[in-house]
């Protein structure tokens, strides 16, 4: 049996719409991501467990794990009969790279089980293609960090899919999932088709400034550049509380930045002072979480990405 874990991720990181993404890991050592277990069988089967498995499609053909299995077999020209178990630990349509977790975990597991017929680049391109079946367009800002770990700059149109961006060791990321769904399709539908020239210039300056600051270890500049003028002004209205209200309350409690994780509704809060984390988490728990499905996790950067947990 092969068991693979794929971590949750924060896409966009505020300033990098469809361009930045990072894998995250809870600092308490728990796992925040999906697990896939596969073993040889006489016929294909797929079963799902985990806290959020009830959110998955009922029809097998609509399950992204099944679609990944079918596509993998198609590429290799051979049908592999496997028993697959999905542990669905990331809520669907949460902004934490839920579909990427499942896609990355199953493709890494299948590739390893079958003797690694696909190399890293081939796997990554396949992951992006399968992600496109969920979101409607091929993109890598979740699958790339989920697969390879770290913070990633996506250069999709340059034939160099991603590059590693260094981060800051003392940064901690509070992620707050309110317990409601916002699909990527709905979240994208509220964005304008065109942006003002001034917004485009400002966005370019913030993004390039952030990447430069990370490489040159200028923390103050990186924080100043974490501004989202592409998505936040339009998506914030979909959330239980507008991000401006969240920002006001968490900044006065010691946070250094906050933003939308992916398409939302999860928000991230960035801190470099560990003493303020408890107060900020308490506020988010009281005012942002909407039901018992919501949760808050204190995370750091996950530099490992997808990994094999069991191989026997």
Curated annotation (Swiss-Prot):
UniProtKB keywords: Amino-acid biosynthesis, ATP-binding, Cytoplasm, Kinase, Nucleotide-binding, Threonine biosynthesis, Transferase
GO cellular component: cytoplasm
Reaction it catalyzes: L-homoserine + ATP = O-phospho-L-homoserine + ADP + H(+)
Annotated signal peptide: none
Residues annotated to bind ATP: 91-101
GO biological process: threonine biosynthetic process
Cellular localization per UniProt: Cytoplasm
E.C. designation(s): 2.7.1.39
Annotated metabolic or biological route of this protein: Amino-acid biosynthesis; L-threonine biosynthesis; L-threonine from L-aspartate: step 4/5
InterPro entries: GHMP_kinase_C_dom, GHMP_kinase_C_sf, GHMP_kinase_N_dom, GHMP_knse_ATP-bd_CS, Homoserine_kinase, Ribosomal_Su5_D2-typ_SF, Ribsml_uS5_D2-typ_fold_subgr
GO molecular function: ATP binding; homoserine kinase activity
Role of this protein: Catalyzes the ATP-dependent phosphorylation of L-homoserine to L-homoserine phosphate.
Family, per entry: Belongs to the GHMP kinase family. Homoserine kinase subfamily.
HAMAP family: Homoser_kinase
Identification of the protein by name: Homoserine kinase
Species assigned in the record: Blochmanniella pennsylvanica (strain BPEN)
């Amino acid at each position: 049996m092969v068991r693979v874990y794929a971590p949750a991720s924060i896409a966009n990181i505020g300033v990098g719409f469809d361009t930045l993404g990072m894998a995250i890991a809870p600092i308490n050592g728990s796992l925040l991501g999906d697990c896939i277990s596969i073993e040889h069988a006489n016929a294909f089967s797929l079963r799902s467990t985990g806290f959020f498995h009830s959110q998955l499609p009922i029809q097998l053909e609509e399950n992204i794990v099944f679609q990944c299995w079918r596509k993998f077999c198609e590429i290799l020209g051979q049908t592999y009969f496997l028993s697959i178990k999905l542990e669905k630990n990331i809520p669907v349509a949460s902004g934490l790279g839920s579909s990427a977790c499942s896609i990355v975990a199953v493709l890494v597991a299948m590739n390893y089980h079958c003797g690694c017929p696909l190399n890293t680049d081939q796997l990554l391109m396949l992951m992006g293609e399968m992600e496109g079946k969920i979101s409607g367009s091929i993109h890598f800002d979740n699958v790339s960090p989920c697969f390879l770990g770290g913070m990633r700059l996506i250069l999709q149109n340059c034939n160099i899919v991603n590059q590693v961006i260094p981060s800051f060791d003392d940064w901690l990321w509070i992620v707050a999932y309110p317990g409601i769904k916002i699909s990527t399709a709905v979240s994208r539908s509220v964005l304008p088709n065109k942006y003002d020239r001034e917004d485009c210039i400002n966005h370019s300056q913030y993004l390039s400034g952030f990447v430069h600051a990370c490489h040159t270890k200028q923390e103050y500049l990186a924080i100043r550049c974490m501004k989202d003028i592409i998505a936040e002004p339009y998506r914030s209205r979909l959330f239980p509380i507008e991000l401006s209200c969240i920002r006001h309350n968490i900044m006065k409690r010691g946070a250094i930045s906050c933003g939308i994780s992916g398409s939302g509704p999860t928000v991230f809060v960035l801190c470099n002072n560990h003493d303020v984390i408890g107060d900020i988490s308490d506020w988010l728990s009281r005012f942002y979480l909407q039901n018992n499905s919501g949760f808050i996790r204190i995370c750091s950067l996950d530099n490992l990405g997808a990994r094999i947990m069991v191989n026997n």
